[in-house]
Design a protein with these regions (language model features):
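Acyl-donor (CoA/ACP) binding surface of acyl/acetyltransferases
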Residues: 1-21, 56-174
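A short helix-loop-beta-strand connector motif used in the catalytic cores of GNAT acetyltransferases and
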Residues: 43-56, 65
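Conserved GNAT-fold acetyl-CoA-binding loop/helix
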Residues: 22-43
């Protein structure tokens, strides 16, 4: 697995992956966002917005997904990842998250990174729980962040958080 800066050349492959019914449904994407043009707009957005750090996830030379830190502030950010369905359950999510979280905590020096998912997206919530360094269901502690992701998704969500110290302690054990 390797992470690369976004490039408009990846739009066609990105569109093919987000067009997969299971991926489109899990992300709650409208039809116009899974087109090649929609992928180009996404790439433009994440490469021009200073409050985002986004990378294309590759296996060799094959685009398999995207990982993004969004709403980056002095202390926190939100992380989101998606993979093409054929890459689910193969460890790519954990590997990509570890790399981007290391950047968030070691380079950006954030204190916490939020991860969340729609409550119906059991697969994503289970994947987050499996990481070991995630504190699950913290919406009551961070209600504004929970409201933010629920406004974006338009549905009930579960908010989780990765605290810098927990992540770095887990990495040190490896």
């Amino acid at each position: 697995m390797n992470l690369r800066e976004h490039d408009e050349r990846y739009a066609e492959a990105m569109s093919a992956l987000t067009s997969q019914p299971a991926v489109k449904e899990a992300l709650g994407l409208p039809d116009d966002m899974v087109t090649v043009e929609g992928a180009k707009k996404f790439i433009w957005h994440v490469t021009t917005d200073e409050r985002q750090y986004s990378r294309a996830i590759f296996d060799g030379d094959t685009l398999i997904g995207v990982i993004t830190l969004k709403d980056i502030s002095a202390e926190s950010a939100h992380i989101g990842t998606w993979l093409g369905e054929q890459y689910w359950g193969l460890g790519y999510n954990e590997e990509a998250k570890s790399a981007v979280l290391a950047y968030a905590f070691n380079v950006l020096e954030l204190k916490r990174v939020f991860a969340g998912a729609a409550k119906r997206n059991i697969r994503s919530l289970k994947a987050q729980e499996k990481l070991g360094y995630v504190t699950m269901d913290v919406g009551k502690r961070y209600p504004i962040d929970l409201i933010t992701i629920e406004k974006i998704t338009g549905e009930p969500c579960q908010l989780n958080v990765i605290l810098r110290d927990n992540f770095l302690a887990q990495v040190a054990k490896r």
